[in-house]
Amino acid sequence: MVVSRPAYTVGMPERISRLNDLAYNVWWTWSNPARLLFKELHPVLWDVVEHNPVLFLHRIDQERLERAAGDQQFLQRYDRVVSAFDRMLGQDASSTWIGKHRPELVGKTVAYFSAEFGLHRALPIYSGGLGVLAGDHVKEASDMGIPLVGVSLLYRQGYLRQRIDHFGWQHDVPANLDPHAEPTTQVFNDD
């Protein structure tokens, strides 16, 4: 399997290079310390990019990254977040809910097919409640140690935004998605 991901690499200080890993793993969507880490780097930009860490890393200026790589307080928080992330990734299945309550299922992957997964507003590939529910299932499965893979479609036009004009009429504004600016990874099979 070949994974293609346009990670932010130009000028990323080595000391904080794991920000790329955090950005492309949607674990940050339910890890408040991870989200706060990005926000701390540039609060205004974090809001401008609507809390999308991939787009954030593409747009943040080099000077802020360099400053963060030398800021001991930031680095302490960064190290705690990266350690928690690594613990989650390397968690022994026997210590999870699935390992304790259904050990016969450890190592068996679940494929979860859904038309959409509402994981976070930064990845607006959902249109309503069922997509949000599917996203919640993915998050809970992760917390329980269930090896679940969400399979879906990536719509180029995500969740519609609405605006009201000066006459009071509602208008839909499509959200055109750039897959390279979203926390997504293109995967190719060997064949």
Task: Give residue spans per PLM region.
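Catalytic cores of carbohydrate-active enzymes across secretory and cytosolic contexts
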Residues: 1-191
